[in-house]
Amino acid sequence: MFEKLKEKLGIAKKDEEHSGNVDVRGTSINVTANSRDFEEIATNLKISLLEADIALPVADRISNVLLKKLDDKSIRLKGDRNSVFKEAVRETIREVASVPPLDVIDNASKKSSYVIMFVGMNGTGKTTSIAKLAELFRSKGYYVVIAASDTFRAGAIEQIALHGEKIGVKVIKHQAGGDPAAVSFDAVKHASKVERSVVLIDTAGRMQNNKNLLEEMKKIKRISNPDLILLTLDALSGTDVLSQAKLFDEAVGINGYIVTKIDADAKGGCVISLLSETKKPILYIGTGQTYSDLVQFSLDWYLNRLLN
């Protein structure tokens, strides 16, 4: 996981562990160097970060902060230079990408009925993510209701209904082509009669230029009045996740993200870009196809897999 980003940051080469140098894009970083020696490194590092799917503004921040930390450390640190570099990377990403966490399970426990609306483009794993979160809530004793409000895509209602059957949760559905907002309304109304309930609203995958579907999404929000709106994003989309986040945030207001297919992403840079640029939390990441393959995200989790 994140092999490409590890390579670009120069922390994947074990043979350098005791050499005193760390390689970044063919440039040997000696952390005992003075500030003049970091100019070439800064340029190479920025290019390397861009190749690892880190957005340009974020790459600028990381390279500037990281190289300053290395320069500061070079004055006083001796020993394992690779460890010094890794610690500088850890401190830099914390500084650039730290966002206050959002615990959806804790938030849901404070209301008798909690409503979550899911949005995202086709192919990002939205429906599967809903099923995974439904299983998580069910396992914690919540009464879970899924609203099959994706009434446009062929087979979408059947797909979410099958998930509900496998998990053992209620699915509210209407006929194909029906009013998505009406489905969400019925689901919220049904759940409101049960204490400790959670409503998970599926919506149609919105293409970025489909204004009609975006308006329908706004209508669902008005009708269901969700406590939380989550955007599902595919880690393999790279820096395009930023344009998707901007689109949906402008349309309905996003509270956080579920990032899917993280297990298949060798680059890993989109996570840093997303946190740094939007300042909104990643709640969960998808690490596989089973219902249990949903991991609560934390920056520590990310850094441990990147640096260890």
Language model feature labels by segment:
Residues 102-308:
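P-loop/Walker A NTP-binding module and the surrounding RecA-like catalytic core of P-loop NTPases
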